[in-house]
Amino acid sequence: MLKLFPTLFIPLSALLLASCSSNPPKSSYNNICSVFDHDSDWEDAALDAEKKWGTPAYILMAFVHQESRFKHDAQPEREYALGLVPLPRRSSAYGYTQAQDPAWYDYQKSTGNWSARRTNIEDSMDFIGWYNYQSFKRNGISRYDTYNLYLAYHEGQGGYSRKTYLRKPWLKKVAYKVTKQSIRYKEQLKRCNQAYSSSSPSKSNGKCRAAWPYC
């Protein structure tokens, strides 16, 4: 069995690596076209989630930009007592979405996707789309309203309905920043769609980088 281990380990390692797409370089964070060009998994996952849950891809991507800067294993920094003893992290937020354990469990239970991982691009995009759909159903937030969608994402559905964000001026500033980022991404998508559609048919294959009406 020991002799077989290396041959089994290599394909398994390759499978695990293939399931996690690479993080885009920092220089491309503010350009959605560059992120999509770096790794088409971002594009595919964002458009799939948009089609499934109704939140535009540019808003989904703006959420990831704010929450993790596209870092798959992002989590709150750990503080140290006396500079030596590691203390518990401030929350269980983890991965591209920075979803905490209870919210991620609710997503898995609701969708039946028990194998979903917060380090996986497709699962992460699907989670944000799903959560925004809950905001739409429970709090009546338009799936195009980046500002209020983000407030609900941060505060939770109950917190949003209680308007806890009104006591957090800093959070409203962050929500505004996410809104600006989504607008930037939206405009970029229009431009890179034009460039994409004008490329040769052999390269474009009729593919569009956004859902209607951006194509």
Outline where the language-model segments fall:
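Low-complexity, Gly/Ser/Thr/Pro-rich intrinsically disordered linker/tail segments
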Residues: 195-215
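Catalytic glycan-binding domains that act on GlcNAc-containing polysaccharides
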Residues: 21-196
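Bacterial N-terminal signal peptides that target proteins for export
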Residues: 1-8
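C-terminal motif of bacterial Sec signal peptides marking the signal peptidase cleavage site
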Residues: 16-19
